[in-house]
Amino acid sequence: MSGNSIGQNFVVTTFGESHGVALGCIIDGCPPGLELNEADMQHDLDRRRPGTSRYTTARREPDEVRVLSGIFEGKTTGTSIGLMIENTDQRSKDYSNIKDLFRPGHADYTYQQKYGLRDYRGGGRSSARETAMRVAAGAVAKKYLKQVHGIEINGFLSQLGPIKAEALDFSQIEQNAFFFPDPSKLDELDEYMRDLKKSGDSVGAKVSVVATGVPVGLGEPVFDRLDADIAHALMGINAVKGVEIGDGFEVVTQKGSEHRDLMSPEGFASNHAGGILGGISSGQPIVAHIAMKPTSSISIPGESITAQGEIAEVVTKGRHDPCVGIRAVPIAEAMLAIVLMDHLLRHRAQNMDVNSQTPTIGMR
């Protein structure tokens, strides 16, 4: 009821706040026998963690995950997997000036009105720090999906502010601090971010995530359509203000003759639908994009109100990301993995004995 869990058969529940003692999560429904250890999760956590480059927040958290339960002798037992990450670099004093002040564009005001109080230190539960546990849980799902079913999930930053990736060289994504697939734009990105930090402002971004090897048939019409659950999961990431599946909002200007993905025995001719038809996976790559707003934690003064309703000026102090989209890449991968894992287990539970006589087709 309180919105801290996602999934039906593969259930992830997270807990913890930005400046609390620790973050944690419980994973229910992971099949037994999966070879798993902390290192499997640490790789993605290191991709997400703060302080890894000059383009992200200066907060330095090692984000070292500890397994509390559910793994014995290097394999999952089928019972609840408990994970924890300690917070070690809190500087709560940086937030003392907003104890009774609402930051525009943040959840300060809405949390106060909903709960009657709020943890103002780093945003408390509303902080993107919480997503560390989603990434850890997503890493578990990613390993199972790849090892058992050959499904791979890859995300990248497709646009930062006005700078768009014009080339998609997936071998370059992990070779730069931006997770950017177009190496010809890296110098431009560096210069743009340097100027942005000097100005004390922030900027939005577009993150893309692609899942390949997904079988036909995942998705539960009508209210648990695969694309609906993916959109729900991605929209639940902090700062996300829009989600696209496939061509997304570009379909507004497309004609039916242009948008439909023609089929032949050799496969689909295109993938405008993003790998999902009628809420069910088609066997093509699943493609999703998220639009992330620029963070409101900037040093440029802005008008707001106090908890007493009085007008006040806000100048945000502390350590913040000038573009939250950079560290969102592994988060988007994790959320897509969690949804696919959940739907794979649900499909297996109901449809494992289905044997369609229609040949399976892929991309031409």
From Swiss-Prot:
GO cellular component entries: cytosol
Requisite cofactors: FMNH2
Reaction equation(s) it catalyzes: 5-O-(1-carboxyvinyl)-3-phosphoshikimate = chorismate + phosphate
Chain positions recorded as NADP(+) binding sites: 48, 54
UniProt keyword terms in alphabetical order: Amino-acid biosynthesis, Aromatic amino acid biosynthesis, FAD, Flavoprotein, FMN, Lyase, NADP
Pathway(s) it belongs to: Metabolic intermediate biosynthesis; chorismate biosynthesis; chorismate from D-erythrose 4-phosphate and phosphoenolpyruvate: step 7/7
GO molecular function, one term: chorismate synthase activity
One GO BP: chorismate biosynthetic process
UniProt keyword NADP present: yes
Pfam families associated with the record: Chorismate_synt
Family to which the UniProt record says this protein belongs: Belongs to the chorismate synthase family.
Listed name of the protein: Chorismate synthase
Organism: Shewanella woodyi (strain ATCC 51908 / MS32)
